[in-house]
């Protein structure tokens, strides 16, 4: 370790003492003091991303799997701007992240150099907390505050802005290695009155239990299953959970539909008891469709994402099983009909083979509806595993989130089930996967089009034969060669065109170390 301890050393030393073990970084000149200090402060793994959105998405995936914050290190306002989309997704997932932004030296800011910007204003919409350090002496207190704020329930991004002169200045005091790691405080308990009211309502009418956050933990799912057995209620998970355990001996979960008319049909006139989720709203505003998809008089809030939803469901299960004289058959799981099966190799074939081969405790990072929807309809038949989805709708999350999950849990195989259009947003993550030798299988569902946009155009009555409509939603002129692209980033790959070829490629990938890309040529 260098004899001279700087503010950068103090920052990293304090972060390590608070529990930081990984830093996803795309540094620039203003962050070089931190880069240098990483050589001296042991215990924090530096992971280089070639694009800031890779770093922020990886920190999100790391947090979802581990429950603890990673550090991100970004360069000034423009670097932060490049990472904002995945910080938006992380905010929606309630992921704890400590997001460090280097700034110009404090004495240089007034000269308005080309990279100068209002970092606080850029950071605020995606951050639960924004803290600016003004001097080296403030660093240790600021990093502790950032950790504590990020871990406060339900979890958030804490952005810490540190000017380069504060990082380069001598440390006011050495970081204490004896400092206690930052931990999440226990979730807030749901009041007894709310439990009793939920039990009263669920005993009088047909009900749907809508689960999110920790209601989707094993405890939450099993308690919800007991409630369903006692009352005949249906159990539905939110459309895009941050992370959910599926398969094995866990209960089968219905998934909330996407389009508003499908949600209203799915829920019918049942009253909806919300645990760890939000009341259903339409993803977009559609003419003639309401934004709120369940009337207020049919909603009961059992718990919010910042409350102990699993415990609340267990307490509710005790209430309803005590008052119920007989077990009722749970309502059948409603599974949407799949579109008429196309000939040849289809998304259903991809989903089916994944279900058959997925190893125990695997992690699936899912982005895109082409293969995602058919997979989630079948996931209950797989071995027990975890699924992460795109919580905020900003595409380009799937591959970086899988990267972060692989670093958080190196003993689990990660599968990125990824649509080809959104994969291009953060394709640089492939390079980091190769460099870090991560056990990740990338299944690229290559239909060479923006399928969701084509669906939306059809719903609006717009023909896809129009020159602009076709030109703006097709990705086949030229087609992206995913195998060559992966090879260029250091990831071996194979292109498959039949279910049999996919079966063999998937088996080979799951039994080989390191990353591998499988390009599935789909209709």
Predicted regions and their residues:
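Phosphate/pyrophosphate-binding active-site segments
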Residues: 2, 137, 276-372, 468-471, ...
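N-terminal alpha/beta PP-like core and its mobile active-site loop of ThDP/TPP-dependent enzymes
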Residues: 2-324, 440-442
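Active-site diphosphate/adenylate-binding microenvironment
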Residues: 8-21, 26-30, 34-39, 330-411
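A general structural motif
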Residues: 51-52, 111-112, 184-197, 256-257, ...
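Surface-exposed loop/turn positions
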Residues: 68, 205, 362, 412, ...
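Short, glycine-/Ser/Thr-/acidic-enriched flexible segments
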Residues: 79, 105, 165-167, 214-216, ...
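Short amphipathic alpha-helices and their capping/turn segments at secondary-structure boundaries
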Residues: 87-89, 147-148, 262-264, 354-357, ...
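Thiamine diphosphate
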Residues: 100, 108-115, 230, 374-523
